[in-house]
Amino acid sequence: MRDFTSELNAFEAAVFEQRPFPAERYDDEYFVADWREAHNRYDIETRRQIEGRNPALIKQVFAPRRVLDMGCGPGALMHLLHELGIDVDGIDFSPHSPTLAPPEVRDRIVVGEVTEPHVEPRTYDLVICREVLEHLTVLQARRTVEQICRASSRYVYVTTRFHPEPDGLLSFTTQLDVDPTHITLLNKEFLRCLLVLEGFRSRPDLEQRMDWAGKGRVLVLERQTDRA
């Protein structure tokens, strides 16, 4: 039988060595300056090009009535979904996010920690959390998963940067060369386990449809009402 003790001990040590970034780290310069590769800024037209088919696919695949974007940043995806007639709200812990957001969605962004409850349970039939978890510690990521699932009455759609070569289920790493706040790249199947433990079942068929760019960074799960 495999002994998991050393793997668990290493995981425990690494988890408690992590330190979270304060909200102030995500200021105007973080979102709109040209420091990212390919000038990947958070203004609407740049995000429209980067998002490509995503907003239309979200509407087509999930047919949502109400959407919550957890870790929405300055609301670019919210705005693109709003253009498609989707009722969408957002939560972000940076106080700069609403001020940078388009006026159409600015008042729909709640400033607060994604690790804490801000909405009533099962209020949204789709909860989105994209490119957020890599900015959090493992402990914060676990609490965020809990809040994502708490808010959803049906689907969760998550994307993040995953560990490219994990040695085990508990492996995680950083990606500081891409973004100095990318402190947690989890094993994809570990994150799936966290979502399953909240009472959600994997939907590989929907993951395939949403991962149209073939990046392998998509998770889609659906609530199992009789078990959650």
Model regions and ranges:
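Short glycine/proline- and charge-enriched loop/turn segments
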Residues: L170-D179
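Conserved N-terminal segment of class I S-adenosyl-L-methionine
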Residues: M1-R122, L126-I128, L139-E146, F162, ...
